[in-house]
Amino acid sequence: MMETEGAKIMNRQWKKYDQLMENCYLGIAGGDSVINEWNDCFDVLIQIIENERESNPDFGRELDLLDDETDYRHDVQGWLEDYLDELDMREMYPRLEAVCRKLLKIFDWKEEYPSEIRFMLASALGSQGKVEEARKYCENWEEQEKDNPLAAAA
């Protein structure tokens, strides 16, 4: 069966993502993780999702289903958790804020609620001195999720 041009492009993008992801982990293993590769990998992932949604608007609507839809070939959810941790560890709070906001926007969050991402966003805001914005964000979050201990802790 002949592969369409769109499928070829998507395969190249996934290969690029996989290579960048591998470089991220090799860097950690070697003790010299390069944050630009982590950032590039995230940007490629977002580009993949947006491109896939052009032909299939339901593609990857939920983060936990993204791995399922790709037959678990790319460990997207696990890599994203590691990326957020890497940004937090490096105290790259403006980028962490931007990444958290993008993740909250790009996925529907109906299957799984993004408590950890919301907590990291609140922390990133506070760490940047955006105390009032962080306070309002946390109050709104707690109002939406009265029984969520992470919302109360934020």
Feature names for model-found ranges:
Residues 39, 43-46, 50, 101, ...:
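Alpha-solenoid helical repeat scaffolds
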Residues 14-29, 60, 70-89, 112-123:
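Amphipathic alpha-helical repeat scaffolds of TPR domains
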Residues 52-58, 110-114, 145-154:
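Boundary/linker segments of alpha-helical solenoid repeat arrays
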Residues 50-73:
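Acidic, Ser/Thr- and Gly/Pro-rich intrinsically disordered linkers and low-complexity segments
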